[in-house]
Amino acid sequence: MADIKYKRVILKLSGEALAGDKGFGINPPVLKDVAKELKEVHDLGVQIAIVVGGGNMWRGVTGAELGMERAQADYIGMLATIMNALSLQDALESIGVPTRVQTSIEMRQIAEPYIRRKAIRHLEKDRIVIFAGGTGSPYFSTDTTAALRAAEINADAILMGKNGVDGVYSADPNKVKDATKFDHLTHMDIIEKNLHVMDTTASSLSMDNHIPLVVFNLNTSGNIMKVVTGQEVGTTIEGD
């Protein structure tokens, strides 16, 4: 059995990652692949919590284009994350992985409300927990949600799965050919160099609570397993 570096993790999944090449909505083959990889890691004994974004369904810029109030647009985004969470729950349970969805906005007919102690108990009972609805408040990103929940459940690390990007670069590698990839950074590097890995609130939360962050390409099969077993994948961000 492989050695486990991170026993309890938060996986931050962007909505775009679930859309895959489609760019919008949910791509069923991608969803199935993610679920299969998560099952392999879960079967290893790793406790997994997931924070999902909603960018494949709704973008804040869309609300701005409509002249919508920021708070209203953010609430729509929260609902988008819940749709993604329920889809991922179904994909996981269809392959035998017990999964619970907890939402920061109560909707008891379809999910549990977020309760910290209950979430931890689910993890201890080897259930995957998906946190949906962001923080439940507008003006906070799902990156901030990941950092907040990681601190609350005492996660060993935040795993940030990116769509087609294999780590943190000095510039957008899709636009700048000679962009430099970083293997290791500190949380302060992210803030000072304005590297746009997470927003400043999320980076500060991670730094203050000493939570490592690993940024990696979700589209490469086996990467989640490599990260939790301590193999060199993507970019590791830790320390002040």
UniProtKB/Swiss-Prot annotation:
Tell me which EC number(s) this protein carries: 2.7.4.22
Q: Which InterPro entries does the protein's record reference?
A: AceGlu_kinase-like_sf, Asp/Glu/Uridylate_kinase, Uridylate_kinase, Uridylate_kinase_bac
Q: Which reaction does it catalyse?
A: UMP + ATP = UDP + ADP
Q: What is its main location?
A: cytoplasm
Query: Source organism's superkingdom?
Result: Bacteria
Subcellular locations according to the entry: Cytoplasm
**NCBIfam families documented for this protein:** pyrH_bact
What is its biological role? Catalyzes the reversible phosphorylation of UMP to UDP.
Q: Which family does it belong to?
A: Belongs to the UMP kinase family.
Can you say what this protein is called?
Uridylate kinase
Organism, as annotated: Limosilactobacillus reuteri (strain DSM 20016) (Lactobacillus reuteri)
